[in-house]
A protein has these predicted regions:
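ATP/Mg2+ or Mg2+-diphosphate-binding catalytic cores
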Residues: 3, 145, 157, 280-323
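Conserved NTP-binding catalytic cores of kinases and kinase-like/nucleotidyltransferase enzymes
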Residues: 1-89, 208, 321-323
Length: 323
């Protein structure tokens, strides 16, 4: 279904006891969700319907969880198709399960696009812009801990081990980081971004975007940085990892039909896109090198984002991205 995983195993007895906190009827079935890299997730079916159970794992700080959960409520009320947290009999939407903070969210219909077309990219671009506008009055603030300073920390943690992924990679990524940091823009329009708008986190029905899930990287950052993330995630062809300008034009045109980028945002897109590619190169390399034994999870191959990073290194004009 989506970009999720299982690190913490939940038994039927534990889940049954957990569900007693809710008016959701009896447990019918549950199944771990294999895809993704963050948190532990299960499909849960009760006599009242279908839900997603999330147990929050390594990168999520418990005191930041209200930011994510309340954001989904805020966006949903503004007409954005995203999950809602389920409130228990005690009025709480967050509680403990198996030593982790956990919540239930509503189940969204639809599925991820496996064949990403320019039409899919246009749907995504428009939805992203609507989400940016809908989040403009969200009162909470959360820094992006996987922005430029966070990349430096990841580089240090990975160190020379990057060369076991590809010879010379440690030096290459360090040089990219230094150049990106030197040229990284400031003062761009900011707001709430999803920060993980990958195809696995976006659902479609009958060719139309039907929902966005997995808001647990959401933060306040430059809105154009989200556009850059999506250029990476949506606008390269699967397998070859070649940049597809038709997809990029479709996405950026649809975005700008709702929220036009200003001149500074357009000029910054090449370095933002390169920075986004580095960010995912680093996290994928780190996760590849630090796999969790026995976890029901599929690590992402960092080679894809290393290839994208090399592409963006050659781009100096944002017109390449269709703006």
């Amino acid at each position: 279904m989506n970009a999720m995983a299982v690190y913490t195993k939940v038994s039927e007895a534990e889940l049954t006891a957990f569900l007693e906190n809710y008016d959701l009827g009896a447990l019918v079935s549950f199944q771990g969700i294999r895809e993704g890299i963050e948190n532990s997730n299960y499909f849960v079916t009760t006599t009242a319907g279908r839900f997603i159970l999330t147990l929050f794992e390594k990168r999520v700080k418990p005191d930041e969880l209200p930011y994510f959960l309340n954001l989904m409520t805020h966006l949903n009320r503004k007409g954005i198709a995203c999950p809602l947290t389920v409130v228990g009999k005690d009025g709480l939407n967050l509680r403990d399960l198996c030593g982790r903070k956990a919540c239930l969210t509503t189940f969204l219909n639809g599925k991820s696009a496996r064949d990403i077309t320019p039409a899919c990219c246009a749907e995504l671009g428009a939805a992203m812009a609507r989400m940016h506008l809908a989040g403009s009055d969200y009162p909470a603030d959360r820094a992006n801990d996987l922005s430029v300073d966070g990349w430096a920390a990841l580089l240090d943690k990975i160190g020379a081990a990057a060369d076991t992924v590809e010879a010379g990679l440690a030096k290459e990524m360090a040089a990219d980081y230094a150049d990106i940091k030197r040229n990284f823009p400031s003062g761009l329009p900011r707001g709430v971004i999803h920060a993980d708008l990958f195809p696995d986190n976006v659902f479609f029905e009958n060719g139309k975007l039907s929902g966005v899930i997995d808001f647990y990287f959401a933060c306040n950052d430059a809105l154009a940085y989200e556009v850059a993330i999506c250029l990476n995630a949506w606008c390269f062809d699967a397998g070859s990892w070649r940049f597809n300008p038709d997809k990029a034009r479709a996405m950026t045109a649809a975005y700008q039909s709702i929220r036009p980028l200003n001149a500074a945002e357009k000029a910054a897109l090449p370095v933002l896109a390169r920075g986004a590619a580095l960010r995912f190169s680093l996290t994928r390399t780190f996760d590849w090198l630090n796999r969790v034994p026995d976890a029901l999870v599929t690590p992402k191959d960092p080679a894809e984002y290393i290839a994208k990073l090399r592409f963006h290194r050659s781009v100096s004009d944002a017109s390449v991205y269709g703006v």
